[in-house]
Structure formats: C-alpha cells, structure tokens
Amino acid sequence: MTLLRHLLTATALLGASVQAAQGVTGSPFGFASGTTGGGDATPAAPSDISQLKTWLSDSTPRVILIDKEFNFLGSEGKCTNCECCKPASNTCGSSGQNAVKQNGSDWCGSYPTLTCTYDNAGIEGLEVASNKSIVGVGSSGVLRGKGLRLVNGVSNIIIQNIHITELNPEFIWGGDAITLDGTNNVWIDHVKINLIGRQMFVAGYEASHSVTISNSEFDGETSWSATCDGHHYWTVLGYGHNDKITFANNYIHHTSGRSPKLEFNSFWHAYNNYWYNNTGHAFDVGKNTRALIEGNVMVQVDTPLLADSNPGAVFAVNTSDVSTCTSTLGRTCVPNTLISSGTLSGSDSSVISSWPSGESDVTVMAASKVASYVKANAGIGKLGNGSGSSSTVGAAATSAVAKRADSDDAPFVPAYSEAGPGASAVPTQPSWSWRTVTNGPAPTGAPSDSPSAPQGLGAPVQASNKHHHQGHGRGY
C-alpha cells in the first residue's frame, strides 16, 4: 500500500514537471483558433508578485508558469472607512452585497451611504500585454485578491489552468476576475473563478475578436449575494461591439443571473456547457447579439433565457429544428437538455444564416455526455483529463460549418443524480476601467438591469421582471 502511494505521488509529480516543461496543454479551438500566446518561449515561474506584474505587462513574449499562490491581498493597502452604498437589492444585510462608491460614477445614486473597508488590489486587474501564456502548474496556480486585465488592443494571449479568487466578494465593484476590452485572439481555458465582487468575466465596449472560453468553472457559491440567496449574480458579461466568442465545455453553478448577459452586435456560440442551480436567469440576450445555443445541459435553472424588451437573436436548438443548421453550417445542430428548469426557446434562423467565418476545430458532443464530461474536466488541475482542444477532442476542421456534430446527438434526459452538486457613467476612452470613469455620454442604447424601482444601472434583475432600458453607463 505504501509502495502504491509512492507510485501515485511520483506519477503526479512527473505530470506536473512535464506540464511545467511544456507550458500550454492542447490547442485553442473555436474563435480563438490559431492563438499561440508566448509561443516557444522558455516556460519560467516568477518569484513573487512584483516579478509577475513585470512579466505580464512587458513586451517580451513569455510562457509564465503560475506554480504557487500569488497573494495580492494587502499588497496595495486597504481603503478603510471609505464611502460605499447599500443598493435596494441588499435586503439581507451582511449576507448581501453593498457597493463601493467609485469616483466619477453616480451608480450609487440616492442609495443610503455607508462606510466600508475593502482591499485596493482587487479593484483593478493586472495588466496583460500581448504574446503571453499564463499557465498554472498542477492545481497550484492561484491568483488571490487580483484579476487579469486585457485592454487597448492586446492580442495573442492564453490563460490556462489558474484559479482567480477573493476579489472583495462582499462588494459590488469589488473587482472583476478577467476583463477584456479591445482584444484579439484570447484563449481562456481550465480556469476556476469564485468569490468575486463583480464580474467573473467581462468583455467591455471595445470589440474582442477571436475569443474562446473553455473548460472553465464559474463557481457562484458565496456568503455575500446580490440576490440574497448565496448565489453570485455577476457572472459572465459580453458588452463588446462585434465580439466573436466561443463559450464551450464550461461549468456554471450556483449563480443567479448574467450567466451570460450579452449585447451589441456580437456572436456567441455556447455549446456543451453545464448549468446547475441558477436561481435567476442564465442567458440575457439583448441588442443585436446573435447567440447559437446548442448541446448544453441546464439543471435547476429558473429562467434559462430572460425576456428582454429589446432582444437579440437566439437560436436555441431543440429536437424539431436540428436540421436548420445543415444548409449553412454543413452539419445538424445538437439539441439542448433542460431538467427541472424553465423554458429555453429561440428559433431565429438569422443566427445561422449570418454566422461569421473564423470559428474552427469545433466538435459538439451530445447532451447525454455533457454533465459527466464537464464535471470531470472543467476548472483547475484537470488538464490531464482532456483539454477540449483540437488536439484532444476532434480533428481539425476548416471552420465550424465544416465540422460534423457528434454522432450521438439525440436529446438526453439524465438521471437526476447526475445533475451534480442606478444610472451611471461610461468610460469615454478605449482603455476600459472601473477607475477611469467620467460622466460622458454612453454609447447609444446601452442597456441596464433594473429590478424593482428605484434601481440603478447594473443592479441585479429578478427573473420574473423584464428589462427596462432606462439608463446608460458603465454599470456592469
């Protein structure tokens, strides 16, 4: 028995050392196909948070190994007895989320003012320059107290196998885990995100082309919930104009909204994701966005698709329209499966007919395989289980339209045990940041979440309410 333990330990260490030597595992697929990150740069691990900051932001192509926890808590001091507010959504006191009052923003409006203490490091993420691979080693790669920020035209970045956590989870505006704004070729893979104050992932107003988010875990279990139910509301937000994003093989659980919320002339392909225990809404598709939703599984999701007063186009595949994809995509689409959930409907064929080129190496598996696959593969420390990349899932195709669906694409109802566990301002500059906010005009028609009045832009919307586009701003 002792020998067996030693063998298992040696095997694990060997796997970690092999990964450390090679850097990125697998190859990007979907819209991020062709992304190389730091390329063939020699993988290296920074010694401390100062060196990590430097390596992330310099102009040198790098493969940066995150081989331990980098703890940013306290590294930029704390804001003590600073001004916050209590939004109307917080009806549960210390179990809810109050909001940091940001300079230059009137998001707090007439909400009661409070004093609060929060960690400065979490408010804004680490700047990431072009041509970087950020790769966690084994299960050790943790960024605590600070996220990542990709803005101002950066490109060719891979983020793989890391855990981002503890960004002022008590506070709205406490920080975002991963921010994109004006990027190209970004692959986010095998990332775990939890205990975040604001968005787990956000794409800002500037277009983020050629992005894939895959095999990642969005863990919404929290002690500070904007919806007062232990579920995180601010999950995935796509606000970029003309974003092209593949969202595949992800595990989204214990959330209550924005899972995802999408706007503004973008294309999102969401396939083979597993949603579990969402007490509010999953998809919120607005203003000119086109969403292709196929081969997903939703279990205990109250509102799979939120009604919107200005909706975008949704093609959510069911058994009756799988053949609609054939003429344009060259394959049948794969039906979604919903268990103990609300309705996911949408059959706007313009999504299919207008689908852009550039999404490649896509294989959509049957819903019958999704729950077990995603639970085994999504998140940190699971690279050896299969990356979901073109090298492990399927042979390359010239585009998404050319790739055949999994042959076993009949709808599936799994056994239940398989389910698993105010108005504000907008940045007037391309560099999208919560700190650099002015009171300039917002882009035309920017939407807002609005539960029962009087709510500010960006407040959590209740599943039973429709959108009211009553303001403009950065209130994401």
From Swiss-Prot:
Cellular component per GO, a single term: extracellular region
Q: Which cysteines are joined by disulfide bonds?
A: 84-108, 325-333
Task: Please list the GO terms describing molecular function.
Answer: pectate lyase activity; pectin lyase activity
**Compartments where found:** Secreted
Q: Where is the composition biased (Basic residues)?
A: 465-476
User: Main EC class of this protein?
Assistant: lyase
Show the ranges annotated as biased composition (Polar residues): 426-453
Keyword list (alphabetical) reads: Carbohydrate metabolism, Cell wall biogenesis/degradation, Disulfide bond, Glycoprotein, Lyase, Polysaccharide degradation, Secreted, Signal
Gene3D superfamilies linked: Single-stranded right-handed beta-helix, Pectin lyase-like
Q: Which reaction does it catalyse?
A: Eliminative cleavage of (1->4)-alpha-D-galacturonan methyl ester to give oligosaccharides with 4-deoxy-6-O-methyl-alpha-D-galact-4-enuronosyl groups at their non-reducing ends
Renumbered to this chain, region (Disordered) spans 412-476
Where does this chain mainly localize?
Answer: secreted
In this protein, the active site sits at: 258
Q: Provide the E.C. number(s) assigned to this enzyme.
A: 4.2.2.10
Give the range the annotation lists for the signal sequence. Answer: 1-20
* GO BP terms: cell wall organization; pectin catabolic process
Q: Which residues are glycosylated?
A: 103, 131, 277, 318, 385
Family statement = Belongs to the polysaccharide lyase 1 family.
Q: What does this protein do?
A: Pectinolytic enzymes consist of four classes of enzymes: pectin lyase, polygalacturonase, pectin methylesterase and rhamnogalacturonase. Among pectinolytic enzymes, pectin lyase is the most important in depolymerization of pectin, since it cleaves internal glycosidic bonds of highly methylated pectins.
Protein name (database record): Probable pectin lyase F
Q: Which organism is it from?
A: Aspergillus niger (strain ATCC MYA-4892 / CBS 513.88 / FGSC A1513)
